[in-house]
Every structure is written in C-alpha cells, then in structure tokens.
Amino acid sequence: MPPHPLRVAVVCSSNQNRSMEAHNILSKRGFDVRSFGTGTHVKLPGPAPDKPNIYDFKTTYEQMYNDLVRKDKELYTQNGILHMLDRNKRIKSRPERFQSCRDQFDLVITCEERVYDQVLEDLNSREQESFQPVHVINVDIQDNHEEATLGAFLICELCQCIQHTDDMENEMDELLQEFEEKSHRPFLHSVCFY
C-alpha cells in the first residue's frame, strides 16, 4: 500500500458532471481527491444543442445556478442541471482547470479520450522537477447524469483497488486488465513524471 493516502484527480471537460460526481463519491469514501476540467470554457446544455451556456472557469457554481434560474428555471430543473449545480456548490465553490493546477497527484483519472490526451499533453509539456510518477487512466464515461453516477462508482472501485496494492507501479497493468474484463470497458493508461 502507498505510504500516504492516494492523491487522486478526476478530470472531465467542464468540471461539472462526470468529474464532480466522482469527486463527490471518492470524497465520501475518504479519498484525497480534487476534480478539474480541461476545456477553455465551462459549457452547460442550453435551450438547444447549438446554444450551450458558456462560462469562464472563474465563475462560481452559485453564479451559474442563479444565471440559469433567471434564464429558464423550469427547463434547467427538468433537465437536471440545477440539481447538478446544487450538488457541485456543496463540494467546492467553482470549477477548476487542470492546466492551471500545479499540485502533484498519484493518479489522474480522465472521463473521455480527448480529455486524456489534453492531460497527457499538459503533463508532458511541464518541466520535470520531482520525477514523481503519476498514473493517468482514462475511463470512458458518457456525459449524462446516469452514466456519470455509474462511472463514478467504477472509478471509486478502481481507486480502492489501487489504494490496496502493495506495489502500484508493478501491479497497475494487471489490475487495469482485470477491470477491463469486469466492466467491459477499455481503459487507457500512461505514466508521466512531475
């Protein structure tokens, strides 16, 4: 088992749905967890697919919530966005961008391949300082409320298994292979260094 609790980052595009659902569940299970997005802006569904609500990462969840209540409370209640923002503001005040964070993690879990590529690109562009390894794992999760919940439990189970390995560096590939077979989902895995 690692000498300290596993430091985990969960990353999706906007730090709203998938990463926050996993953040919520991992936090309740006692993990040292943070969540992030990799997009240039935070996007939430709007009144039509081609009209998303776009916010800066500095915008708080509370401000987004109030803005959407003002725009169309019924629509955003019905589609679950207000409920999601209400959960988010109880976890932290605003979304965070992965590329702006300089904290070090043992494990970074992404929720889609495009985000995985952005995280790897960011980590590989940083100057190496501590040469501390970080495992980056992608778990593909569709961006809807139900899949976010199922994906969060899968991520939690994966983190619990990794937390209990004796030798994370040597057991990771075998562990991920077992998870792929069990969950019928492909996982991507890379190791980067801080």
Swiss-Prot record:
EC number: 3.1.3.16
Keyword presence, Hydrolase: yes
A Pfam family annotated for this UniProt entry: Ssu72
Root EC class: hydrolase
A single MF term (Gene Ontology): RNA polymerase II CTD heptapeptide repeat phosphatase activity
Family: Belongs to the SSU72 phosphatase family.
Protein name per Swiss-Prot or TrEMBL: RNA polymerase II subunit A C-terminal domain phosphatase SSU72
Source organism: Danio rerio (Zebrafish)
